[in-house]
From Swiss-Prot:
Lineage of origin: Eukaryota, Metazoa, Chordata, Craniata, Vertebrata
Name of the protein: ER membrane protein complex subunit 8
Residue ranges the record marks as coiled coil: none
Keyword Metal-binding: no
Keywords noted in UniProt: Endoplasmic reticulum, Membrane
Pfam families: UPF0172 (PF03665)
Membrane-related topology note: Peripheral membrane protein
Principal location class: endoplasmic reticulum
Residue ranges of every copy of the MPN domain listed in the record: 4-150
Superkingdom per UniProt: Eukaryota
Quaternary context: Component of the ER membrane protein complex (EMC). EMC8 and EMC9 are mutually exclusive subunits of the EMC complex.
Family: Belongs to the EMC8/EMC9 family.
GO CC, alphabetical: cytoplasm; EMC complex; endoplasmic reticulum; endoplasmic reticulum membrane; Golgi apparatus; membrane
Compartments, record wording: Endoplasmic reticulum membrane
Length: 210
């Protein structure tokens, strides 16, 4: 599987989703720009080597994550939005309800496998709640790849952020200003369709802090 990186915007929104609902399981989607045909025989990890860059995060649900009808509605709407913006649904993230549980459960593996049907380099990201602090001193994620029909954890010591110092600084600033209170997930959108799950205000806040 190619390398995986998250932009600061994608990482921050994932962190804010968990911060808004600290006592619930939360999940969401990660989107990447549509890939151009790549040249073959590029050296692995060398100049020009391929990697997937998650440019944004779409928060889905909090609390009950296994409601299939709601997931289908979300996937359909988000897939349509992605096509309009030349994006593709390329990853899935989840934070479990129990603090010390950072392993993918059946829901996580099922949704990630569904995404992998349309995007071969799909990543499953689990949020490690034990590493979560208001200062964001360390990345809080474990990245899993689909290999031989199983989801396997990649090197936990690898830096999966495009710019970790920036992501750390901005996520800490957003947590300090309680920006998570304004974060909208798909559950919030279903409660009131005026709630925008693309979170333009948080996107602006991230850009302003860059």
């Amino acid at each position: 599987m190619p390398g995986v990186k998250l932009t600061t915007q994608a990482y921050c929104k994932m962190v804010l989703h968990g911060a808004k609902y600290p006592h619930c399981a939360v999940n969401g989607l990660l989107v990447a720009e549509k890939q151009k045909p790549r040249k073959e025989h590029l050296p692995l990890g060398g100049p020009g080597a391929h990697h997937t860059l998650f440019v944004d995060c779409i928060p889905l649900f909090h609390g009950t994550l296994a409601l299939a009808p709601m997931l289908e509605v979300a996937l359909t709407l988000i897939d349509s939005w992605c096509k309009d913006h030349s994006y593709v649904i390329a990853g899935y993230y989840q934070a479990n309800e129990r603090v010390k549980d950072a392993s993918p459960n059946q829901v996580a593996e099922k949704v990630a496998s569904r995404i992998a049907e349309g995007f071969s380099d799909t990543a499953l990201i689990m949020v490690d709640n034990t590493k979560f602090t208001m200062d964001c001193v360390a990345p809080t994620i474990h990245v899993y790849e689909h290999h031989e029909n199983r989801w396997r954890c990649r090197d936990p010591h690898h830096d999966y952020c495009e710019d970790w110092p920036e992501a750390q600084r901005i996520s800490a600033s957003l947590l300090d200003s309680r920006s998570y209170e304004t974060l909208v997930d798909f559950d919030n959108h279903l409660d009131d369709i005026r709630n925008d799950w693309t979170n333009p205000e948080i996107n602006k806040a991230v850009l302003h802090l860059c």
